[in-house]
UniProtKB/Swiss-Prot annotation:
Antimicrobial peptide with activity against fungus (C.albicans) and Gram-positive and Gram-negative bacteria (S.aureus and E.coli). Also has low hemolytic activity against human erythrocytes. Keywords: Amphibian defense peptide, Antibiotic, Antimicrobial, Cytolysis, Fungicide, Hemolysis, Immunity, Innate immunity, Secreted. It comes from the Eukaryota. Expressed by the skin glands. This is Pseudin-2. Disulfide bonds: none annotated. It is found in: Secreted. GO terms for biological process: defense response to bacterium; defense response to fungus; innate immune response; killing of cells of another organism; xenobiotic metabolic process. Belongs to the frog skin active peptide (FSAP) family. Pseudin subfamily. It holds the Pfam family Antimicrobial19. InterPro entries: Antimicrobial_19. GO terms for cellular component: extracellular region.
Length: 24
């Protein structure tokens, strides 16, 4: 339920951080 959604959101957040680091 909500916990799984939280985990997915965390994964997306981590991916965005990685992409931002890579772009800079």
């Amino acid at each position: 339920g909500l916990n799984a959604l939280k985990k997915v959101f965390q994964g997306i957040h981590e991916a965005i951080k990685l992409i931002n680091n890579h772009v800079q």
